Amino acid sequence: MRVEILSSKIHRATVTDANLNYVGSITIDEELMRAANLLENQKVEILDVNNGERFATYVIKGKKGEICLNGAAARKVCIGDIVIIVAYASMKFKKAKKFSPTIVHVNAKNEMIKK
C-alpha cells in the first residue's frame, strides 16, 4: 500500500507580493527552496494562516526573501499574510513509517531560523 505523506514544509512564511498578471505559481526564495528540498515546478499546497485558504500551485525560483503568489492564486492571499508551504510524497507504507519530512522555519523576513 502507498500513502501520501508530508515531505517538505516552509513554516509561517510571509507573503511579499501577489502578482495577478503572472501566468501562475508561487515564487519562493531559492535558498528556502534548497533548504526545504523543493524543486522548480514541483506541486505544493499553500495554507494561508490569516484567511484559512488552502490551494495548490507549483514552485518557481525567486530572489532572497521572496514569497510571491502569482496568477489566480494572487486573489487568495494578501501581502503580509502568513502562509505554510507544503509538499507531499507518495511512498510505501513501510518506508513512510520511518520517513522524516524536511521542515524549514522562517522569520517575518523569510529568513531561515531553524531547519
Curated annotation (Swiss-Prot):
Cofactor note text: Binds 1 pyruvoyl group covalently per subunit.
Root EC class: lyase
InterPro entries the record matches: Asp_de-COase-like_dom_sf (IPR009010), Asp_decarbox (IPR003190)
Domain of life the protein comes from: Bacteria
EC number(s) stated in the UniProt entry for this protein: 4.1.1.11
The keyword Lyase is annotated on this UniProt entry: yes
Compartment annotation: Cytoplasm
GO cellular component, one term: cytosol
Reported modifications of this chain: Is synthesized initially as an inactive proenzyme, which is activated by self-cleavage at a specific serine bond to produce a beta-subunit with a hydroxyl group at its C-terminus and an alpha-subunit with a pyruvoyl group at its N-terminus.
Active site (catalytic residues): S25 (schiff-base intermediate with substrate), Y58 (proton donor)
Cofactor: pyruvate
Keywords per UniProt: Autocatalytic cleavage, Cytoplasm, Decarboxylase, Lyase, Pantothenate biosynthesis, Pyruvate, Schiff base, Zymogen
Pfam families tied to this protein: Asp_decarbox (PF02261)
Record keyword Lyase present: yes
Recorded metabolic or biological pathway in which this protein acts: Cofactor biosynthesis; (R)-pantothenate biosynthesis; beta-alanine from L-aspartate: step 1/1
Pyruvic acid (Ser) modified-residue sites: S25
Catalytic activity from the UniProt record: L-aspartate + H(+) = beta-alanine + CO2
Entry binding sites for substrate: T57, G71, A72, A73
GO molecular function: aspartate 1-decarboxylase activity
Chain's role: Catalyzes the pyruvoyl-dependent decarboxylation of aspartate to produce beta-alanine.
Subunit annotation: Heterooctamer of four alpha and four beta subunits.
Family: Belongs to the PanD family.
PANTHER family: ASPARTATE 1-DECARBOXYLASE
Protein name: Aspartate 1-decarboxylase
Organism: Campylobacter curvus (strain 525.92)
Lineage per the UniProt record: Bacteria, Pseudomonadati, Campylobacterota, Epsilonproteobacteria, Campylobacterales
